[in-house]
UniProtKB/Swiss-Prot annotation:
GN (gene name): LIN52
Disulfide bridge positions per record: none
Family: Belongs to the lin-52 family.
Entry-linked Pfam families: LIN52 (PF10044)
One annotated Gene Ontology cellular component of this protein: DRM complex
Keyword terms, alphabetized: Phosphoprotein
Phosphoserine PTM sites in chain numbering: S26, S51
Complex formation: Component of the DREAM complex (also named LINC complex) at least composed of E2F4, E2F5, LIN9, LIN37, LIN52, LIN54, MYBL1, MYBL2, RBL1, RBL2, RBBP4, TFDP1 and TFDP2. The complex exists in quiescent cells where it represses cell cycle-dependent genes. It dissociates in S phase when LIN9, LIN37, LIN52 and LIN54 form a subcomplex that binds to MYBL2.
Name the UniProt record assigns to this protein: Protein lin-52 homolog
Length: 114
């Protein structure tokens, strides 16, 4: 038998074929939309060579280390870290609520009367 079954990749490639005919060649069909834009964009310095953004000036070494640590985590480990932070935030909210209630009962939050 000289024939073989078509593989799934052959079917995929066949489904991606386009038989659309363009009227003109690409440069004629898609001329530069706004003349001079390419030169204008090229005139700006690369963001890599320019000075770092303002927000990066405030980042400390510990922050960079934390970003590297978070970047090296797997998806599951990152989700576990996020869950831990959510639980911590919830617990801090409960503690704050408890302390505010305590302060209210002790009348330490009232404004002094004049």
């Amino acid at each position: 038998m000289g024939w073989k079954m078509a593989s799934p990749t052959d079917d995929l490639e066949a489904s991606l074929l386009s038989f659309e005919k363009l009227d003109r060649a690409s440069p004629d069909l898609w001329p530069e939309q706004l003349p001079g834009v390419a030169e204008f964009a090229a005139s700006f310095k690369s963001p890599i060579t320019s000075s770092p953004p303002k927000w990066m000036a405030e980042i400390e070494r510990d922050d960079i280390d934390m970003l590297k640590e978070l970047g090296s985590l797997t998806t599951a480990n990152l989700m576990e870290k996020v869950r831990g932070l959510q639980n911590l935030a919830y617990q801090l909210g409960l503690d704050e609520s408890r302390e505010m209630t305590r302060g209210k009962f002790l009348n330490i939050l009232e404004k002094p009367k004049k």
